[in-house]
Amino acid sequence: MTLKMPKNNCFKTKLILSALAFTALISSCTIGGLTSDYNKLTAKEKQRVVKSFGDIDQLKADNTIYLVEVQQVKDYCNKHQQVVIYDYTPNCGSSACMQVNDFVDMCKANGTNPLVIGNSFWGLADTRKLGIPLLMIDPQPLGTKWRSRYIRLFFKELIDSNSPNPPEELYFSFQNGKYIGNFRSCKEALQALNIKDVKTL
């Protein structure tokens, strides 16, 4: 004998399963909130956030979190032969994300300048010293408080893109100031710079 489940129960079951699947997806990568999450910082952590001006090379590699604008990053890329930028989301558990210290070490091992640019304050203050300045997108000049929008605007302006589709990956390669591409892994970003036998960690 086959029991038929009432249609309403079927719908409720599907709804519950969909909700569980969505929850699992969200918890697989902690992506921060709708805004920069600045208000989640403690008073002491907020004191570490500083608006930067001018040359990124002049910033200290201490526990300061430096707010940066697009032009500062462009100027940095123009000064250095090879740069890989990590669009860094603290606490991210996605397979595309890597430990930020590993990213810095891997770039340096391959003769490339690493730049870590955070897109959320949530967890950024817990980042260990990297040996390079810790940067954070400054949302104010982009004219929006919404995180997804300021990330999109920042990187579209950085790569001089007129495409309606924003870059989707986390790693950006530049050579002598020229944008090379947007990649899913640090290794791919380094390979795009014509580095043979990329050293991995």
Spans of features found by a protein language model:
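C-terminal motif of bacterial Sec signal peptides marking the signal peptidase cleavage site
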Residues: 25-28
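Short active-site neighborhood of thiol/selenol oxidoreductases, capturing the structured segment around
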Residues: 74-102
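Short, internal strand/loop/helix patches
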Residues: 129-168
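Structural microenvironment flanking redox-active thiols in thiol-disulfide oxidoreductases
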Residues: 85, 96-136
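Post-signal peptide N-terminal segment of mature Sec-exported envelope proteins
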Residues: 38-59
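A short, hydrophobic beta-strand/beta-hairpin element that forms part of a small beta-sheet core
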Residues: 165-182
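Bacterial signal peptide processing site
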Residues: 30-33
